Regions:
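OB-fold nucleic-acid-binding modules
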Residues: 360-410, 461-512, 541, 545-547, ...
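Short nucleic-acid-contacting surface segments enriched for D/E, G, S/T with interspersed K/R
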Residues: 435-453, 491, 537-555
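OB-fold (S1/OB) nucleic-acid-binding surfaces
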Residues: 393, 403-435, 503-536
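Charged, glycine-rich intrinsically disordered N-terminal tails and low-complexity linkers that flank
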Residues: 1-93, 210-212, 218
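A non-catalytic, helix-rich entry segment at domain boundaries
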Residues: 59-213
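Metal-dependent nuclease catalytic regions and adjoining charged, substrate-binding loops involved
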Residues: 7-9, 198-202, 206, 212-218, ...
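Metal-dependent nuclease catalytic cores in nucleic-acid-processing enzymes
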Residues: 255-289, 450-453, 457, 552, ...
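Non-catalytic protein-protein interaction segments used by genome-maintenance enzymes to assemble
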Residues: 184-266, 429, 540-544
Length: 589
């Protein structure tokens, strides 16, 4: 099955604590690049290539969802498909334009008007040619082992290939309103032939069609490791001939600067497939390059290699989970052969940008435009009531009596986490896992006088909260030892100021179909950066109008945490944002 659900809970969407194929390849290229881009979450200006890659892949899958009527030859089938490619090329160009124009931060030296619809059409035609190689082989082999089963109307796969007129597969169907009452039927000319008759060209298209992400399904469609610490999202799965072949689609060509990452990416997918399937081993892996119409083949890992990858990937994930604490250093102290949370890389690996920035190369390194670079070279001064980002407390010890336990229940990211309640005198405070699986033995703690060590202080809905993770500990407190910080004295908000160095907005749909939106930007105070987020109604036009290089001050930002790093949140009622003027005049959002 190319789609599953997390075995131990947690989000179906991307998680900063799970190992993914793209995260792995980034980590292997440059450790600090992974840390800043993936864990800290700092972005760079959007490029046309990033938009193009997504819309082209979606357009190719939209074409393959179609179901042809009777065809006399492969040439007739190809002509039918090329007409669909013409329509999808224009549609993809239009979607790309809208995505580009709605991006808050994009390359100033790029213009969507330079993108040609014909370029989209060429890539789609090349992708179809690679698919037609499968169709031809399917026809030559008389439909493969599943022809007669298909003709009976019974899918040979647990999760069918997405196609027009067929019911889609939702990973969590109980979250979809009125799923069984929906009518997914749609007119199409396809019909199966009688049993034992020769295969027809439209049947070869129907059988050879790979699995891909169904565009009608708003829920994430991923595989999840049985222990929950790795996940992957496949592009295509070819399986018509009884063998499993995993395919990754690339819009460029095999000589691109990121091409070396393809093998690592496919090895990860093959490993994850093997660890999520008792049967149906991977036969091989392929990369389809749409610019050059290339099919690059790779052998599937052996059993010995898969066992070695278990240890390798688990070790990498553990390193990722423990990297960084609190606010993150930027620029780096110096360049190092082993870049990490404090040391920079040499900037030569594909994708390197922020990770190569040091105190000595501010004038040349990094992805900044002229405005942002000038502001960062000027530096940043901090005045009362604001404090440096590096001085925001990240760990506290708090004692009291555990009086209640609950969960797992959704947190503010809609992730299922465990919770409990701590009482000290008249004061009470909620305790919660910092993220799913971060403190699995929370409910094993004795409901007595305890001390919680290395907890992360924060606030949610105006109520103080303690977050616990793998660095935290709960134990019985001895009578003669210090009680730690009093609940009423916990610091749950922060006043900070600095320069906006990155910004982006993300929109999506929850498992139940309800929309969500989040705007995030990164604030730099001259030495450190932190992520600042606003959700839903807290996203104002004033926030959306901010751009990298703007100087701002946040008063009363909520203190939160994401994967052990500070994440400040904007409370629409109590957080004030001040944009810099000569006198730093207050302007509330």
């Amino acid at each position: 099955m190319p789609v599953g659900t997390p075995p131990k809970g947690g989000p179906l969407g991307r998680s900063r604590s799970r190992l993914s194929a793209s995260g792995l390849t980034t980590y292997l290229r440059c450790t600090r690049q992974w840390y800043l881009n993936r864990k800290v979450g700092i972005s760079s200006p959007k490029t046309i290539g990033q938009v193009l890659g997504i819309v082209i892949e979606d357009a190719l899958c939209n074409i393959m969802m179609n179901r042809p009527g009777p065809m006399e030859s492969i040439e007739e089938l190809r002509e039918w498909a090329e007409e669909l490619a013409d329509e999808q090329a224009q549609s993809a160009w239009d979607i790309g334009l809208e995505t580009w124009e709605n991006s808050l931060w994009k390359r100033t030296d790029s213009d969507w008007s330079t993108v040609e619809v014909q370029d989209f059409k060429n890539k789609l035609s090349n992708g179809l040619e690679l698919f037609f190689e499968e169709i031809q082989r399917c026809y030559d082999e008389n439909g493969g082992p599943y022809l007669e089963q298909f003709r009976t109307g019974v899918e040979p796969y647990n999760i069918p290939t997405p196609k027009i007129g067929a019911k889609p597969h939702f990973p969590v169907p109980e979250k979809v309103r009125s799923l069984d009452a929906r009518d997914w039927s749609k007119e199409h000319p396809f019909e199966w032939m009688e049993p034992d008759s020769p295969i027809q060209w439209n049947e070869a298209w129907e059988i050879a069609r790979p699995w891909f992400k169904d565009p009608r399904v708003h829920q994430p469609q991923r595989m999840f490791h049985p222990e929950g610490w790795a996940a992957g999202e496949l592009d295509l799965v070819l399986r018509w001939d009884g063998n499993i072949r995993l395919v990754d689609i690339k819009s460029g060509h095999s000589g691109g600067k990121f091409s070396e990452s393809l093998q690592h990416q496919l090895r990860f997918y093959a490993w994850l497939w093997e660890r999520t399937h008792d049967q149906s081993p991977v036969k091989n892996m392929e990369g389809w390059y749409l610019s050059s119409k290339e099919r690059i083949l790779y052998e599937a890992p052996s059993n010995e290699e898969l066992t070695s990858m278990d240890e390798e990937f688990f070790s990498i994930n553990n390193i990722m989970r423990t990297m960084g604490e609190g606010a993150s250093i930027l620029p780096a102290v110096a360049e190092s052969e082993t870049p990490d949370t404090t040391n920079a890389c040499d900037g030569t690996s594909p994708g390197c940008g922020w990770c190569s920035l040091t105190q000595s190369n501010m004038e040349t390194a990094g992805p900044m435009d002229d405005k942002l670079r000038k502001k960062m070279i000027e530096g940043n001064s901090i005045s009362s009531p604001c404090v440096p980002l590096g001085e925001i407390p990240s760990r506290v010890n708090v004692s009291g009596n555990l009086i209640a336990q609950w969960g797992p229940l959704p947190n503010h990211f809609n992730e299922p986490v465990l919770g409990a309640m701590l009482q000290a005198g008249e004061a009470t405070i909620a305790i919660e896992e910092a993220e799913p699986g971060a403190f699995l033995h929370l409910h094993d703690s004795q409901q007595t006088n305890v001390i919680i060590e290395n907890a992360l202080p924060g606030v949610w809905r105006d109520q103080p909260r303690l977050y616990v993770d793998q660095h935290s500990n709960i134990r019985v407190r001895q009578e003669d030892e210090p009680k730690g910080t009093r609940i009423g004295l916990l610091r749950t908000r922060a006043n900070v100021e600095g320069v906006v160095v990155a910004i982006r907005q993300q929109n999506g749909v929850r498992l139940d179909g309800k929309p969500w939106s989040m705007l995030s930007f990164h604030l730099w105070d001259g030495e450190h950066i932190v992520e600042v987020v606003a959700f839903g109604s807290a996203i104002s036009e004033r926030l959306r109008s901010m751009r990298p290089g703007d100087r701002i001050r946040l008063i009363g930002a909520e203190l939160g945490w994401r994967a052990g790093l500070i994440q400040l949140r904007i409370d629409v009622r109590k957080t004030r944002i001040e944009h810099q003027t000569p006198a730093f005049t207050t302007k509330s959002i």
